[in-house]
Every structure is written in C-alpha cells, then in structure tokens.
Amino acid sequence: MTAPSQVLKIRRPDDWHVHLRDGDMLKTVVPYTSEIYGRAIVMPNLASPITTVDAAIAYRQRILDAVPAGHDFTPLMTCYLTDSLDADELERGFHEGVFTAAKLYPANATTNSSHGVTSVDAIMPVLERMEKLGMPLLVHGEVTHADVDIFDREARFIDTVMEPLRQRLTALKVVFEHITTKDAAQYVRDGSYNLAATITPQHLMFNRNDMLVGGIRPHLYCLPILKRNIHQQALRDLVASGFTRAFLGTDSAPHSRHRKETRCGCAGCFNAPSALGSYAAVFEEMNALAHFEAFCSLNGPQFYGLPVNTGWVELVRDEQQIPENIALADDSLVPFLAGETVRWSVKK
C-alpha cells in the first residue's frame, strides 16, 4: 500500500467567487485571499453596489491598497446588474479591462441584493450585449418568490429562469455560482461548453444536518442554504469525476460575529483562511487528488479565457488549528471551521 503524499504542489489557484466587503472589514480579510490566490472574482454587492466603471476602479484600488507587500494578487471586478443598468457603461468597462464579468442577483436573494434584478426581461438588452461581447454572466441561481421553499429555490430557478434564458441566448457564457443541488450538478454536467459552475468548500463538506442537528450552527449558515446529503453527494461526485466546467469559488463572505450570532443572523461563511486545505481534504476523501489542481487552478482560467498562473502553491499534510476568532476594529470575525483542526495547510 502506498503511503499518502505529504505535499501537494499545484499551480497557484484562483478564487472565482469572493466577497471582500469594504472599509475595515476589507482591510482585515483581503490578505487571507491575496496570500494564496493569484486572482479572485470580486463580488459587487456592497451597500452601494458596483454599477459603474468609476465605482469599480475605485473599489479595485481600495482592494489593492489592502494587499500586503509581497503578495502578487489581481482582483477581477464585476458589475452588479440592475433593472436600469446602461449597457453602454457595461461594454465600456469590459473593453477597458475593468469589468471581467457581470453579476445577476435576483432581488433580495442574499446580502445586499435589494437592488438586484426583478426579472430577466428587464435586463434583456444588457444580456444580449453581453452575449455579443463574450462577457460572462455570473448567476446567483435562486428564485425569491414567497411561495417557494428555501430548499427548493435553486431547482425552481433552473426551470423557470436559467433554462429559458439559455434557450433565448444560446451563446451567452454563464457561470452558475455556488451550486448546491443534484439538480444543478446534473444541469451543468449536461450543459454546453459555455455553462460552468463554482462550488464552495462548505457545500462539499456539509449538509443541512450539520447545520441544524444538535443545535443551530450559525457559522454554517449561507445562501444558497446547505441542502440534504443527496445533494452534497452529487456535488462531491461532480468534482471527483474531473468534470472540467466546475471550479473553485469559495463564496467567502465575512460578517462580524454580532451579525452572525443574533436572533436574525446574516448568511455567509468566512472560509478564506481554510478553503484551499478544505478542498484538498474533500478531494483526498474521494480519492480524487488527481483532479485537485484542475479544479483549483486550471478549469477556471480555461473557461474565462485567461492564462494559468505561473507560480505554484504547496499544501502540506500538517495539522493546523483554525483560530476561534479574528479581531476586527470593534468586533471579531469567526472563520469557517473555527477551533477545528484541518489536515492540509498552505506552506508559508
């Protein structure tokens, strides 16, 4: 029997879905991403969403100002789609290299999404322009109708929004972000070359029992919400198969402790400190480490038409405890897997 490897060396990965927030929170969380990843697709759902080229340029500079010396990191900016967004502004940002992609949030689907899209028809001229440009559309794939159960929102979105949209704009490049169901896994697997998906570490590692049985664990609460075990297993099977249109997107989403541990807590897991090691543990459990580098470092650039990073990252089999909390200016931040021991850690 071959002894398990003690070191995993992969091309420097990218994070194709991250929330860096703003202000003091941004300054705290950016180094956890910039230390490990060469690039990251930065979500635009700030309190004042990023809807213009100038706003994206200013936000990008605030991010770069928070990157520590010695970190080689490029934030890839996204435009927040609204019913009133100007297609010319979006095209200008894409041509000028400011916007890498645009993000569709259904109105009120998640944090800071009240400005989101009320219907696909409302933004059809913008989507048609994106199709012509070859600009990727990033989709939070949940319906928000009051009569749809929260555990059914993703599956319903496929039938009522995603599939009709892709039938209408067959050349539109779409990333179905943070997929959580067997329905989405099968839909992406059966889809064409221009449909891809990101998957978070928490949706590969946990299901809704982990969040709800024996007490509520607010730091596992995110949107889309954790689903049944059968859905978790479908995601694991998808990445273990070496499917090339699925790639790393942590959806790392920090909230201060008092906003998570309260009677109406916020959705989001701050997983940036432990995500890469968490993914490695999942791939190892599935005897799929042969596909780990592609998921982290190759599939995303291939879909986006970007070069692979030139640097390398090493993960070592060296147990490391995740801190219980991370200090903020006037609160603290509880990271994903706080207080737990992880098997794989990034070599500093």
From Swiss-Prot:
Its EC number(s): 3.5.2.3
Q: Which domain of life is it from?
A: Bacteria
Which cysteines are cross-linked by disulfides? none
Keywords, ordered alphabetically:
Hydrolase, Metal-binding, Pyrimidine biosynthesis, Zinc
The protein's matches in Gene3D superfamilies, at most eight in alphabetical order, are given as: Metal-dependent hydrolases
Annotated positions of the N6-carboxylysine modification: 103
Q: Which residues form the active site?
A: 251
Report the GO molecular function annotations: dihydroorotase activity; zinc ion binding
Name the coenzymes or cofactors required: Zn(2+)
The metabolic or biological pathway listed in the UniProt record of this protein is: Pyrimidine metabolism; UMP biosynthesis via de novo pathway; (S)-dihydroorotate from bicarbonate: step 3/3
The cofactor note reads: Binds 2 Zn(2+) ions per subunit.
Q: Where does substrate bind?
A: 19-21, 45, 140, 223, 255, 267
Which major enzyme category is it?
hydrolase
Biological processes per GO annotation: 'de novo' pyrimidine nucleobase biosynthetic process; 'de novo' UMP biosynthetic process
What residues does Zn(2+) 2 bind to?
103, 140, 178
Q: Name one GO cellular component term.
A: cytosol
Reaction equations catalysed? (S)-dihydroorotate + H2O = N-carbamoyl-L-aspartate + H(+)
- Residues at which Zn(2+) 1 binds: 17, 19, 103, 251
Pfam entry (one): Amidohydro_1
List, alphabetically, the PANTHER family matched: DIHYDROOROTASE
**Subunit text:** Homodimer.
Q: Which family does it belong to?
A: Belongs to the metallo-dependent hydrolases superfamily. DHOase family. Class II DHOase subfamily.
List the protein's name.
Answer: Dihydroorotase
In which organism is this protein found?
Salmonella typhi
The gene coding this protein: pyrC
